[in-house]
Amino acid sequence: KWYEKNETNDLDFFGYGWDKHVFKGSKIIKVFNKFNLLTKFLAPKFKNYKGSFEGKKIDLLKEYKFSYCIENAKGFKGYITEKIFHCFFALTVPVYLGCPNITDHIPKECFVDMRDFNSVRDIHIFLKNMPNEKFVNYQKSIKNFLHSDKFIPFSNKHYIETLKDNIFV
């Protein structure tokens, strides 16, 4: 919401459902969700909303220096989803909020930690004024992490090995 009011040209957001109103309540009320024209007509209008993206998320992320990366669930130790890794694979610096012990798994030099700021405005100022050298250092740290042993637990190979060892015994 802060970007909508203050810096509309500095944030693009994508996703499903942001262009639709959702009727809540009884089953009778929820029936209106089936009327696409009505849900689109009543939907809130966001200046920053760019629609849903049908291609590969990593290809889209490559077009941006930064991406807000907010987990759907916060406060669960060790809960790290693909969101931050999509940014890493695109060499887009994540602005992260979610796992409280993220730095036990991923080096702090790889992302901007939203918890270090008092407001979205403060984050925006930090990102806007970041020297290119610092941005490049984030990217170098991301590359180093992706090629380190710390990344192994998050790799496809490790996931397959875990399945093989625990399910297909």
Which residues does each PLM region occupy?
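Acidic/glycine-enriched connector segments
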Residues: 18-20
